[in-house]
Amino acid sequence: MRVSYDELKNEFKRVLLDRQLTEELAEECATAFADTTQAGAYSHGVNRFPRFIQQLEQGDIVPNAIPTKVLSLGSIEQWDAHQAIGNLTAKKMMDRAIELASQHGVGVIALRNANHWMRGGSYGWQAAEKGYIGICWTNALAVMPPWGAKECRIGTNPLIIAVPTTPITMVDMSCSMYSYGMLEVHRLAGRQTFVDAGFDDEGNLTRDPSIVEKNRRLLPMGFWKGSGLSIVLDMIATLLSNGESTVAVTEDKNDEYCVSQVFIAIEVDRLIDGKSKDEKLNRIMDYVKTAERSDPTQSVRLPGHEFTTILSDNQANGIPVDERVWAKLKTL
Protein backbone atom coordinates (compact mmCIF):
# COMPACT_ATOMS: atom_id res chain seq x y z
CA MET A 1 0.00 0.00 0.00
CA ARG A 2 0.99 3.64 -0.45
CA VAL A 3 0.14 6.55 1.82
CA SER A 4 0.62 10.27 1.43
CA TYR A 5 3.39 12.12 3.21
CA ASP A 6 0.89 14.11 5.27
CA GLU A 7 -1.07 11.01 6.26
CA LEU A 8 2.09 9.29 7.46
CA LYS A 9 3.39 12.34 9.28
CA ASN A 10 0.04 12.90 10.99
CA GLU A 11 0.04 9.32 12.29
CA PHE A 12 3.52 9.78 13.72
CA LYS A 13 2.50 13.07 15.31
CA ARG A 14 -0.67 11.60 16.80
CA VAL A 15 1.31 8.86 18.54
CA LEU A 16 3.90 11.33 19.82
CA LEU A 17 1.30 13.75 21.18
CA ASP A 18 -0.38 10.83 22.94
CA ARG A 19 2.98 10.27 24.70
CA GLN A 20 2.89 13.86 26.01
CA LEU A 21 5.51 15.34 23.69
CA THR A 22 5.08 19.06 23.18
CA GLU A 23 3.44 20.25 19.96
CA GLU A 24 6.75 21.64 18.69
CA LEU A 25 8.75 18.51 19.50
CA ALA A 26 6.08 16.16 18.11
CA GLU A 27 6.00 18.16 14.86
CA GLU A 28 9.79 18.08 14.53
CA CYS A 29 10.07 14.39 15.34
CA ALA A 30 7.15 13.35 13.11
CA THR A 31 8.69 15.31 10.25
CA ALA A 32 12.03 13.55 10.71
CA PHE A 33 10.43 10.09 10.60
CA ALA A 34 8.25 11.02 7.61
CA ASP A 35 11.23 12.47 5.72
CA THR A 36 13.29 9.33 6.35
CA THR A 37 10.49 7.09 5.12
CA GLN A 38 9.76 9.21 2.05
CA ALA A 39 13.47 9.15 1.18
CA GLY A 40 13.25 5.37 0.88
CA ALA A 41 14.86 4.31 4.17
CA TYR A 42 11.76 2.38 5.26
CA SER A 43 13.68 0.14 7.66
CA HIS A 44 14.77 3.14 9.72
CA GLY A 45 11.64 5.24 9.24
CA VAL A 46 8.12 3.85 9.60
CA ASN A 47 9.32 0.31 10.31
CA ARG A 48 11.50 1.51 13.19
CA PHE A 49 8.92 3.86 14.73
CA PRO A 50 7.24 1.27 17.04
CA ARG A 51 10.67 0.45 18.49
CA PHE A 52 11.28 4.16 19.03
CA ILE A 53 8.00 4.43 20.92
CA GLN A 54 8.91 1.40 23.03
CA GLN A 55 12.16 3.05 24.10
CA LEU A 56 10.35 6.33 24.72
CA GLU A 57 7.91 4.57 27.05
CA GLN A 58 10.76 2.74 28.80
CA GLY A 59 12.49 6.01 29.59
CA ASP A 60 15.56 5.26 27.45
CA ILE A 61 14.72 8.37 25.42
CA VAL A 62 14.33 11.64 27.33
CA PRO A 63 12.34 13.83 24.91
CA ASN A 64 12.84 17.15 26.70
CA ALA A 65 16.58 16.70 27.24
CA ILE A 66 18.80 19.38 25.72
CA PRO A 67 22.26 18.39 24.39
CA THR A 68 25.09 20.41 25.93
CA LYS A 69 28.64 21.18 24.85
CA VAL A 70 31.18 19.66 27.22
CA LEU A 71 34.51 20.58 25.63
CA SER A 72 35.81 22.70 22.75
CA LEU A 73 39.19 22.29 21.06
CA GLY A 74 38.89 24.57 18.04
CA SER A 75 37.58 22.39 15.23
CA ILE A 76 36.70 19.53 17.63
CA GLU A 77 33.87 19.62 20.14
CA GLN A 78 32.56 17.11 22.64
CA TRP A 79 28.83 17.08 23.42
CA ASP A 80 26.51 15.20 25.79
CA ALA A 81 23.09 14.28 24.38
CA HIS A 82 21.59 13.45 27.80
CA GLN A 83 19.54 10.73 26.04
CA ALA A 84 17.60 13.22 23.91
CA ILE A 85 15.70 12.08 20.80
CA GLY A 86 18.32 10.51 18.55
CA ASN A 87 17.46 11.73 15.06
CA LEU A 88 16.79 15.31 16.16
CA THR A 89 20.03 15.46 18.13
CA ALA A 90 22.04 14.00 15.25
CA LYS A 91 20.72 16.67 12.89
CA LYS A 92 21.79 19.39 15.33
CA MET A 93 25.24 17.84 15.71
CA MET A 94 25.87 17.73 11.97
CA ASP A 95 24.68 21.33 11.71
CA ARG A 96 27.25 22.23 14.35
CA ALA A 97 29.98 20.27 12.54
CA ILE A 98 29.18 22.28 9.40
CA GLU A 99 29.44 25.54 11.37
CA LEU A 100 32.87 24.51 12.65
CA ALA A 101 33.97 23.47 9.16
CA SER A 102 32.98 26.88 7.80
CA GLN A 103 35.39 28.41 10.33
CA HIS A 104 38.22 25.87 10.40
CA GLY A 105 37.86 23.87 7.17
CA VAL A 106 36.85 20.79 9.16
CA GLY A 107 34.43 20.30 12.03
CA VAL A 108 34.31 17.27 14.32
CA ILE A 109 31.57 16.66 16.87
CA ALA A 110 31.84 13.72 19.27
CA LEU A 111 28.58 12.95 21.06
CA ARG A 112 28.00 10.78 24.12
CA ASN A 113 24.86 9.47 25.82
CA ALA A 114 23.02 9.53 22.50
CA ASN A 115 20.07 7.52 21.26
CA HIS A 116 19.59 5.63 18.00
CA TRP A 117 19.78 8.16 15.16
CA MET A 118 17.46 6.15 12.86
CA ARG A 119 18.77 6.73 9.30
CA GLY A 120 22.41 7.71 9.57
CA GLY A 121 22.49 8.66 5.90
CA SER A 122 20.26 11.65 6.65
CA TYR A 123 23.16 13.45 8.32
CA GLY A 124 25.75 12.75 5.64
CA TRP A 125 23.21 13.92 3.05
CA GLN A 126 22.55 17.01 5.17
CA ALA A 127 26.22 18.01 4.88
CA ALA A 128 26.53 17.15 1.18
CA GLU A 129 23.44 19.23 0.32
CA LYS A 130 25.31 22.25 1.68
CA GLY A 131 28.45 21.44 -0.30
CA TYR A 132 30.41 19.72 2.46
CA ILE A 133 31.80 16.21 2.71
CA GLY A 134 29.83 14.53 5.51
CA ILE A 135 31.16 11.62 7.55
CA CYS A 136 29.47 10.14 10.59
CA TRP A 137 29.20 6.90 12.50
CA THR A 138 27.76 5.48 15.69
CA ASN A 139 28.54 2.57 17.93
CA ALA A 140 25.75 0.27 19.00
CA LEU A 141 24.63 -2.67 21.09
CA ALA A 142 26.61 -5.88 20.52
CA VAL A 143 24.39 -7.60 17.94
CA MET A 144 27.03 -9.21 15.70
CA PRO A 145 29.68 -11.87 16.32
CA PRO A 146 33.27 -10.77 15.69
CA TRP A 147 34.99 -12.74 12.96
CA GLY A 148 35.75 -16.24 14.27
CA ALA A 149 33.12 -16.18 17.04
CA LYS A 150 29.53 -17.31 17.57
CA GLU A 151 28.67 -14.90 20.35
CA CYS A 152 27.64 -11.28 19.68
CA ARG A 153 30.38 -8.97 20.94
CA ILE A 154 30.47 -6.12 18.38
CA GLY A 155 27.97 -3.61 16.99
CA THR A 156 26.88 -3.11 13.41
CA ASN A 157 28.21 0.46 13.90
CA PRO A 158 26.88 2.21 10.75
CA LEU A 159 29.30 4.42 8.82
CA ILE A 160 28.19 7.15 6.41
CA ILE A 161 30.34 9.03 3.90
CA ALA A 162 28.63 11.58 1.64
CA VAL A 163 30.21 13.59 -1.19
CA PRO A 164 28.63 16.75 -2.69
CA THR A 165 28.20 15.51 -6.25
CA THR A 166 25.12 15.96 -8.45
CA PRO A 167 23.28 13.83 -7.49
CA ILE A 168 24.81 13.26 -4.05
CA THR A 169 27.07 10.22 -3.78
CA MET A 170 26.76 8.53 -0.40
CA VAL A 171 27.76 5.29 1.26
CA ASP A 172 25.45 4.47 4.17
CA MET A 173 26.42 1.08 5.52
CA SER A 174 26.44 -0.97 8.65
CA CYS A 175 29.50 -3.12 9.32
CA SER A 176 27.33 -6.17 8.69
CA MET A 177 26.19 -7.33 5.27
CA TYR A 178 22.63 -6.46 6.35
CA SER A 179 21.28 -4.41 9.23
CA TYR A 180 18.49 -5.95 11.26
CA GLY A 181 16.18 -3.34 9.75
CA MET A 182 16.97 -4.54 6.23
CA LEU A 183 16.54 -8.17 7.29
CA GLU A 184 13.04 -7.19 8.40
CA VAL A 185 12.37 -5.52 5.03
CA HIS A 186 13.31 -8.73 3.20
CA ARG A 187 11.31 -10.93 5.58
CA LEU A 188 8.20 -8.75 5.24
CA ALA A 189 8.59 -8.90 1.45
CA GLY A 190 8.74 -12.71 1.66
CA ARG A 191 12.11 -12.96 -0.03
CA GLN A 192 15.62 -14.10 0.71
CA THR A 193 18.45 -11.59 0.92
CA PHE A 194 20.32 -10.92 -2.31
CA VAL A 195 23.64 -12.13 -0.87
CA ASP A 196 24.56 -14.09 2.25
CA ALA A 197 23.29 -12.31 5.36
CA GLY A 198 24.61 -14.46 8.18
CA PHE A 199 25.05 -17.96 9.52
CA ASP A 200 22.45 -20.60 10.31
CA ASP A 201 22.52 -22.62 13.53
CA GLU A 202 24.97 -25.09 11.98
CA GLY A 203 27.40 -22.37 10.99
CA ASN A 204 26.56 -22.38 7.28
CA LEU A 205 26.07 -19.15 5.34
CA THR A 206 22.40 -18.35 4.78
CA ARG A 207 20.21 -15.88 2.94
CA ASP A 208 17.14 -16.57 5.07
CA PRO A 209 16.47 -13.32 6.95
CA SER A 210 14.25 -14.94 9.57
CA ILE A 211 17.01 -17.34 10.63
CA VAL A 212 19.53 -14.54 11.13
CA GLU A 213 16.99 -12.34 12.92
CA LYS A 214 16.39 -15.21 15.33
CA ASN A 215 19.91 -16.51 16.00
CA ARG A 216 21.56 -13.06 15.65
CA ARG A 217 24.56 -14.41 13.76
CA LEU A 218 25.00 -11.55 11.29
CA LEU A 219 27.72 -11.79 8.68
CA PRO A 220 30.23 -8.94 8.98
CA MET A 221 30.63 -6.94 5.78
CA GLY A 222 33.72 -8.22 4.00
CA PHE A 223 34.07 -10.99 6.61
CA TRP A 224 37.01 -10.08 8.89
CA LYS A 225 37.24 -6.60 7.37
CA GLY A 226 33.78 -5.54 8.54
CA SER A 227 34.49 -7.06 11.93
CA GLY A 228 37.70 -5.07 12.24
CA LEU A 229 36.06 -1.87 11.02
CA SER A 230 33.31 -2.20 13.62
CA ILE A 231 35.87 -2.53 16.40
CA VAL A 232 37.97 0.51 15.45
CA LEU A 233 34.90 2.71 14.85
CA ASP A 234 33.71 1.80 18.34
CA MET A 235 37.12 2.63 19.81
CA ILE A 236 37.36 6.02 18.08
CA ALA A 237 33.79 7.07 18.96
CA THR A 238 34.37 6.06 22.59
CA LEU A 239 37.64 7.98 22.85
CA LEU A 240 36.52 11.16 21.09
CA SER A 241 33.25 11.43 23.02
CA ASN A 242 34.54 10.09 26.35
CA GLY A 243 31.34 8.07 26.17
CA GLU A 244 30.15 4.49 26.31
CA SER A 245 31.62 1.70 24.19
CA THR A 246 29.71 -1.20 22.66
CA VAL A 247 30.67 -3.41 25.59
CA ALA A 248 29.53 -0.76 28.11
CA VAL A 249 26.19 -0.26 26.37
CA THR A 250 25.68 -4.02 26.13
CA GLU A 251 26.69 -4.95 29.68
CA ASP A 252 25.69 -1.85 31.66
CA LYS A 253 22.38 -0.86 30.03
CA ASN A 254 19.14 -2.78 29.67
CA ASP A 255 18.71 -1.70 26.02
CA GLU A 256 20.46 0.25 23.26
CA TYR A 257 20.87 3.79 24.54
CA CYS A 258 23.71 6.08 25.69
CA VAL A 259 25.64 5.23 22.51
CA SER A 260 28.56 7.30 21.19
CA GLN A 261 28.55 9.06 17.81
CA VAL A 262 30.89 11.12 15.63
CA PHE A 263 29.93 13.77 13.05
CA ILE A 264 32.50 15.24 10.66
CA ALA A 265 32.04 17.97 8.05
CA ILE A 266 34.79 19.01 5.64
CA GLU A 267 34.56 22.21 3.61
CA VAL A 268 35.51 21.59 -0.01
CA ASP A 269 35.18 25.01 -1.61
CA ARG A 270 38.34 26.48 -0.08
CA LEU A 271 40.37 23.46 -1.21
CA ILE A 272 39.37 23.42 -4.87
CA ASP A 273 37.56 25.83 -7.21
CA GLY A 274 34.04 24.95 -8.27
CA LYS A 275 34.82 24.27 -11.94
CA SER A 276 37.69 21.91 -11.13
CA LYS A 277 35.64 20.18 -8.45
CA ASP A 278 32.77 19.46 -10.83
CA GLU A 279 35.08 18.31 -13.62
CA LYS A 280 36.99 15.91 -11.39
CA LEU A 281 33.90 14.47 -9.73
CA ASN A 282 32.01 14.07 -13.01
CA ARG A 283 35.00 12.31 -14.56
CA ILE A 284 35.05 9.83 -11.67
CA MET A 285 31.32 9.17 -11.93
CA ASP A 286 31.33 8.87 -15.72
CA TYR A 287 34.29 6.49 -15.62
CA VAL A 288 32.46 4.23 -13.17
CA LYS A 289 29.07 4.38 -14.91
CA THR A 290 30.43 3.61 -18.39
CA ALA A 291 32.12 0.36 -17.35
CA GLU A 292 30.90 -2.66 -19.33
CA ARG A 293 27.91 -4.11 -17.52
CA SER A 294 27.98 -7.62 -16.13
CA ASP A 295 24.21 -7.71 -16.70
CA PRO A 296 23.03 -5.63 -19.70
CA THR A 297 19.68 -4.97 -17.99
CA GLN A 298 21.24 -3.54 -14.83
CA SER A 299 23.04 -0.19 -14.80
CA VAL A 300 26.29 0.25 -12.93
CA ARG A 301 25.52 1.52 -9.47
CA LEU A 302 26.90 4.63 -7.82
CA PRO A 303 26.17 4.65 -4.08
CA GLY A 304 23.27 6.81 -2.98
CA HIS A 305 22.20 7.91 -6.46
CA GLU A 306 19.10 5.73 -6.27
CA PHE A 307 17.68 7.85 -3.44
CA THR A 308 17.05 10.80 -5.75
CA THR A 309 14.86 8.59 -7.96
CA ILE A 310 13.13 6.95 -4.99
CA LEU A 311 12.31 10.31 -3.41
CA SER A 312 10.83 11.65 -6.65
CA ASP A 313 8.69 8.53 -7.06
CA ASN A 314 7.45 8.62 -3.47
CA GLN A 315 6.64 12.33 -3.72
CA ALA A 316 4.63 11.73 -6.89
CA ASN A 317 2.92 8.43 -6.07
CA GLY A 318 2.84 8.14 -2.29
CA ILE A 319 5.08 6.31 0.15
CA PRO A 320 5.14 2.48 0.18
CA VAL A 321 4.28 1.08 3.62
CA ASP A 322 3.86 -2.60 4.43
CA GLU A 323 0.24 -3.21 5.45
CA ARG A 324 1.33 -5.01 8.63
CA VAL A 325 3.55 -2.10 9.61
CA TRP A 326 0.74 0.37 8.89
CA ALA A 327 -1.71 -1.65 10.97
CA LYS A 328 0.74 -1.68 13.88
CA LEU A 329 1.27 2.07 13.60
CA LYS A 330 -2.49 2.65 13.75
CA THR A 331 -2.70 0.74 17.05
CA LEU A 332 0.03 2.71 18.82
UniProtKB/Swiss-Prot annotation:
Question: What keyword terms does UniProt attach to this protein?
Answer: Cytoplasm, NAD, Oxidoreductase
Stated EC number for the protein is 1.1.1.130
State the superkingdom: Bacteria
Has UniProt tagged this entry with the keyword NAD? Answer: yes
| Binding residue positions for NAD(+) | I168, T169, M170, V171, D172, M173, S174, W224, K225, G304, H305, E306
User: Where is it localised?
Assistant: Cytoplasm
Q: One Pfam family name from the record?
A: Ldh_2
Give the InterPro entries listed for this entry: Diketo_gul_Rdtase (IPR023689), Mal/L-sulf/L-lact_DH-like_ah (IPR043144), Mal/L-sulf/L-lact_DH-like_NADP (IPR043143), Mal/L-sulfo/L-lacto_DH-like_sf (IPR036111), Malate/L-lactate_DH-like (IPR003767)
Q: Which GO terms describe its molecular function?
A: 3-dehydro-L-gulonate 2-dehydrogenase activity; NAD+ binding
Query: Could you state one GO cellular component term attached to this entry?
Result: cytoplasm
Against Gene3D superfamilies, the record matches this protein to: 1.10.1530.10, Hypothetical oxidoreductase yiak, domain 2, Hypothetical oxidoreductase yiak, domain 3
- Provide the active-site residues from the annotation: H44 (proton donor)
The record's catalysed reaction(s) read: 3-dehydro-L-gulonate + NAD(+) = 2,3-dioxo-L-gulonate + NADH + H(+); 3-dehydro-L-gulonate + NADP(+) = 2,3-dioxo-L-gulonate + NADPH + H(+)
Query: What family, per the record?
Result: Belongs to the LDH2/MDH2 oxidoreductase family. DlgD subfamily.
Stated role = Catalyzes the reduction of 2,3-diketo-L-gulonate in the presence of NADH, to form 3-keto-L-gulonate.
Note the subunit structure.
Answer: Homodimer.
What's the protein called, per UniProt? Answer: 2,3-diketo-L-gulonate reductase
The organism of origin for this protein: Haemophilus influenzae (strain PittGG)
Gene label:
dlgD
